[in-house]
Regions:
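Short, well-ordered strand-loop elements centered on a beta-strand within folded domains, enriched
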Residues: 30-31, 120-128
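C-terminal boundary/linker segments immediately following FHA domains
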Residues: 122, 135-180
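Short hydrophobic/aromatic patches on the structural cores and recognition surfaces of FHA
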Residues: 92, 111-115, 124-126, 130-135, ...
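General beta-strand recognition
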Residues: 91, 101, 122-124, 156
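Intrinsically disordered, low-complexity acidic Ser/Thr-rich regulatory segments
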Residues: 1-103, 168-180
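Short, well-ordered turn and helix-capping elements at secondary-structure junctions
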Residues: 96-98, 111, 140, 145
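Short coil-to-beta-strand transition motifs
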Residues: 104-109
Length: 180
């Protein structure tokens, strides 16, 4: 099973009593924070279970209200390997064998992977020929091409499910900004 997601509220409460250095030491991993969630679960592929995004009845529910961000609904996924894995890349998808499991029907079983850039704290992402595609800041990326991710980049799994990428420093700054 992949890493267990925590809620944004959990991190917000932790950040309240910490300096930036303490937070970054305690939470040393980059994160993916949910931006939107799927509302309609109809029209899934019978073979893979992936929700196919070719129907105008599909509804996107963007999380835009800060009160909704602070609720227990928003999930945060740490960008890290499962302890039992030997491969360095971080795999993301719907299947329980991934390092990060996104239980959303618009996400493919093996949707994308993150590659750590040697001697840096940066990552590249690669779409693994997903059914609905991967979008980086609204632009669809081609399967198997590497794309570097930066703080505040929006990753879309198809067009329905978005996550925002944060380094530990940027995540702390975002949390402190939510408190003010």
């Amino acid at each position: 099973m992949g890493n267990v997601a925590k809620t944004l509220t959990c991190y917000l409460e932790a950040a309240e009593g910490m300096s930036e250095d303490e937070f970054i030491t305690t939470y040393a991993y980059s994160v993916l924070v949910e931006k939107s969630a799927i509302v309609s679960l109809e029209h899934s592929s019978l073979l893979s279970g992936t929700k196919l995004l070719n129907d105008t009845r599909d509804v996107l529910h963007p999380i835009t209200d800060s009160s909704e961000l602070i609720s227990n609904k928003v999930k945060v996924f740490e960008l890290r390997k499962r302890s039992s894995s030997l491969v360095k890349d971080i795999f993301v998808g719907r299947a329980p064998t991934n390092d990060i499991v996104l239980a959303n029907p618009s996400v493919s079983k093996s949707h994308l992977r993150f590659i750590s850039i040697p001697r840096t704290k940066h990552y590249q992402l690669v779409d693994m020929f997903s059914s609905n595609g991967t979008y980086l800041n609204g632009k669809k990326i081609n399967p198997f091409e590497k794309h570097q991710v930066e703080d505040h980049d929006e990753l879309s799994f198809g067009i329905e499910y978005q996550l925002i990428y944060y380094s530990p420093q940027a995540f702390y700054e975002m949390l402190i900004g939510l408190k003010s």
